[in-house]
Amino acid sequence: MDKMLFWVSVFTIFLDVFAQTDLDKKVFVFPRESSSDHVNLITKLETPLQEFTVCLRAYSDLSRHYSLFSYNTPGKDNELLIYKEKLGEYSLYIGGTKVTARVPEEILAPVHICTSWESSSGIAEFWINGKPLVKKGLKRGYSVAAHPKIILGQEQDSYGGKFDRGQSFLGEIGDVYMWDSVLSPDDVQAVYYGSYVNGSILNWQALNYELNDYVIIKPRVWD
């Protein structure tokens, strides 16, 4: 292989592994249970969060618990974690404290999840497939720390690592957005139907990410 072809190959691999790109109508595929496969979502968040909304789509046939969105900061485990406990139960952790929302659910169905929280009231909201669940409260007056490691596919037990296969995600994740505000009900509906974009912290259509180990990008073929 000549030098030019070699460096073109290296550059292509680099773009595939560490990239900013429009992932509209695509998904990250996590094809196996592991303690290593994950995606690092890269953001320059330098100010603590007083409120936020996270939305994503997921499709998995796992029956056990697993992490959907893991946000850790130095010295703070489960600073912000969206976690599926079991069929029909979703938890939000803020500063190591959690609340759980419950919803009737089919095991093999894709799901759209939006979760929001605001410090002033401590109210956490869950929306599953565009429908609001019972509001819960936690960590009133708290600030979610800045400079996070945001991981898909694994739950962090340290800053950016210490993964457990038994908490890993197997399946497909897409349409990941994060805002530094609580979205209105109308905006959540718009996100669910795919017409509201431009997340201020994470934007699926202009995403900085790093693929680690066995994670593949494929077209999304489900709703």
Swiss-Prot record:
<keyword id="KW-0106">Calcium</keyword>
<dbReference type="InterPro" id="IPR030476">
    <property type="entry name" value="Pentaxin_CS"/>
</dbReference>
<keyword id="KW-1015">Disulfide bond</keyword>
<keyword id="KW-0325">Glycoprotein</keyword>
<dbReference type="GO" id="GO:0046597">
    <property type="term" value="P:host-mediated suppression of symbiont invasion"/>
</dbReference>
<feature type="binding site">
    <location>
        <position position="157"/>
    </location>
    <ligand>
        <name>Ca(2+) 2</name>
    </ligand>
</feature>
<dbReference type="GO" id="GO:0044871">
    <property type="term" value="P:negative regulation by host of viral glycoprotein metabolic process"/>
</dbReference>
<feature type="binding site">
    <location>
        <position position="155"/>
    </location>
    <ligand>
        <name>Ca(2+) 1</name>
    </ligand>
</feature>
<dbReference type="GO" id="GO:0042802">
    <property type="term" value="F:identical protein binding"/>
</dbReference>
<dbReference type="GO" id="GO:0005615">
    <property type="term" value="C:extracellular space"/>
</dbReference>
<feature type="binding site">
    <location>
        <position position="167"/>
    </location>
    <ligand>
        <name>Ca(2+) 2</name>
    </ligand>
</feature>
<dbReference type="InterPro" id="IPR013320">
    <property type="entry name" value="ConA-like_dom_sf"/>
</dbReference>
<feature type="signal peptide">
    <location>
        <begin position="1"/>
        <end position="19"/>
    </location>
</feature>
<keyword id="KW-0011">Acute phase</keyword>
<keyword id="KW-0479">Metal-binding</keyword>
<comment type="subunit">
    <text>Homopentamer. Pentraxin (or pentaxin) have a discoid arrangement of 5 non-covalently bound subunits.</text>
</comment>
<dbReference type="GO" id="GO:0001849">
    <property type="term" value="F:complement component C1q complex binding"/>
</dbReference>
<dbReference type="GO" id="GO:0045656">
    <property type="term" value="P:negative regulation of monocyte differentiation"/>
</dbReference>
<dbReference type="GO" id="GO:0005509">
    <property type="term" value="F:calcium ion binding"/>
</dbReference>
<keyword id="KW-0034">Amyloid</keyword>
<protein>
    <recommendedName>
        <fullName>Serum amyloid P-component</fullName>
    </recommendedName>
</protein>
<feature type="binding site">
    <location>
        <position position="157"/>
    </location>
    <ligand>
        <name>Ca(2+) 1</name>
    </ligand>
</feature>
<feature type="binding site">
    <location>
        <position position="77"/>
    </location>
    <ligand>
        <name>Ca(2+) 1</name>
    </ligand>
</feature>
<feature type="binding site">
    <location>
        <position position="78"/>
    </location>
    <ligand>
        <name>Ca(2+) 1</name>
    </ligand>
</feature>
<dbReference type="InterPro" id="IPR001759">
    <property type="entry name" value="Pentraxin-related"/>
</dbReference>
<feature type="binding site">
    <location>
        <position position="155"/>
    </location>
    <ligand>
        <name>Ca(2+) 2</name>
    </ligand>
</feature>
<dbReference type="InterPro" id="IPR051005">
    <property type="entry name" value="Pentraxin_domain"/>
</dbReference>
<dbReference type="GO" id="GO:0006953">
    <property type="term" value="P:acute-phase response"/>
</dbReference>
<feature type="domain" description="Pentraxin (PTX)">
    <location>
        <begin position="24"/>
        <end position="223"/>
    </location>
</feature>
<feature type="binding site">
    <location>
        <position position="156"/>
    </location>
    <ligand>
        <name>Ca(2+) 1</name>
    </ligand>
</feature>
<comment type="similarity">
    <text>Belongs to the pentraxin family.</text>
</comment>
<keyword id="KW-0732">Signal</keyword>
<feature type="glycosylation site" description="N-linked (GlcNAc...) asparagine">
    <location>
        <position position="198"/>
    </location>
</feature>
<dbReference type="Pfam" id="PF00354">
    <property type="entry name" value="Pentaxin"/>
</dbReference>
<keyword id="KW-0964">Secreted</keyword>
<feature type="disulfide bond">
    <location>
        <begin position="55"/>
        <end position="114"/>
    </location>
</feature>
<dbReference type="GO" id="GO:0046790">
    <property type="term" value="F:virion binding"/>
</dbReference>
